[in-house]
């Protein structure tokens, strides 16, 4: 029997609608309109698509968006100066620097320059640290989006064996913290993990984010597991696929996210949610 598909597009639309209603209510209450500043450096086509999607989501929610498209040659000092200006601008609630940045730029230094209360991506060490000590402020968008999806489908991680494959700062590490916060028993797998197939086979909830097409084989999946595929990879024929071998995995899993249409839309919905939250922090 095929797994139930977890429809991130549908869940994200409901969340965007709720955010739009909250923004409209703010305007009725004479509170300022939330504002997101997005910075794109260079002409990376994928980055440009992501930025366009974020602008579209802002329009749907009634959130003001500012766009800064800088040339590939932008220096570290120039980018830091822009971040400083946006930090100081009281009209800007959220700042997002689109990754990856050109190789000559120090991404970590730039992310750390963003004020934690404007860090709507949730990448600042302060925000990751708050999540680690069970006091989240700005939660990383993709991991929080995954938790929202689980909640929407009535999946409670409490007491479940959750396995995260991938230990990146953007997905794997904060995802493990989110699952731990939800009281799952969490295992994180990475490039030094031995017997990966055995670890995957033990998972009640499996979250995979490694950026390698079809990396996790469908036959490894525990029957009845919930599979969340964060990966999105473009194959030579132009088609998109995730990090999990979808066709075989869906015959074993109880629920699974498709790629595209699973986690991706939730990342953007959570970004809008974080921008609204940042605006509420700045009301005082």
Curated annotation (Swiss-Prot):
HAMAP family: THF_DHG_CYH. Its EC number is 1.5.1.5, 3.5.4.9. This is Bifunctional protein FolD. Belongs to the tetrahydrofolate dehydrogenase/cyclohydrolase family. It catalyses: (6R)-5,10-methylene-5,6,7,8-tetrahydrofolate + NADP(+) = (6R)-5,10-methenyltetrahydrofolate + NADPH; (6R)-5,10-methenyltetrahydrofolate + H2O = (6R)-10-formyltetrahydrofolate + H(+). InterPro entries: Aminoacid_DH-like_N_sf, NAD(P)-bd_dom_sf, THF_DH/CycHdrlase, THF_DH/CycHdrlase_cat_dom, THF_DH/CycHdrlase_CS, THF_DH/CycHdrlase_NAD-bd_dom. Pathway: One-carbon metabolism; tetrahydrofolate interconversion. The keyword Hydrolase applies.
